């Protein structure tokens, strides 16, 4: 059903819309547009629209979202694990350095006492 600003297409655009779509023009816009009949969509009603396909698309979108959430969780977990592992290595390395310094100074102290 056309609005006040829409007019049916003239003979020059007779076959513009496909699959039974109705062609309309808006005088201020140079190109025509289509109002598609049921089960068709697209700029020129060129695509078949199956109601089940929208359900399938929603299902695929949900599956993609779940997969993305799992992937992000795994990445965060791996990052956390690596950071904690790196932190413990750094802490034990510092402890090793402190022990090495203490051992060295104790050894040096003992060697001075022996002379």
From Swiss-Prot:
Residues 5-46 form the EGF-like domain. Disulfide bonds join 9-23, 17-34, 36-45. Glycans are attached at residue 39. The chain crosses the membrane at residues 63-83. Gene3D superfamilies: Laminin. Proteolytic cleavage close to the plasma membrane on the external face leads to the release of the soluble growth factor form. Extensive glycosylation precedes the proteolytic cleavage. The keyword Mitochondrion does not apply. Keywords: Cell membrane, Disulfide bond, EGF-like domain, Glycoprotein, Growth factor, Membrane, Secreted, Transmembrane, Transmembrane helix. The cytoplasmic domain may be involved in the regulation of trafficking and proteolytic processing. Regulation of the proteolytic processing involves initial intracellular domain dimerization. ERBB receptor binding is elicited entirely by the EGF-like domain. This is Pro-neuregulin-4, membrane-bound isoform. The gene is NRG4.
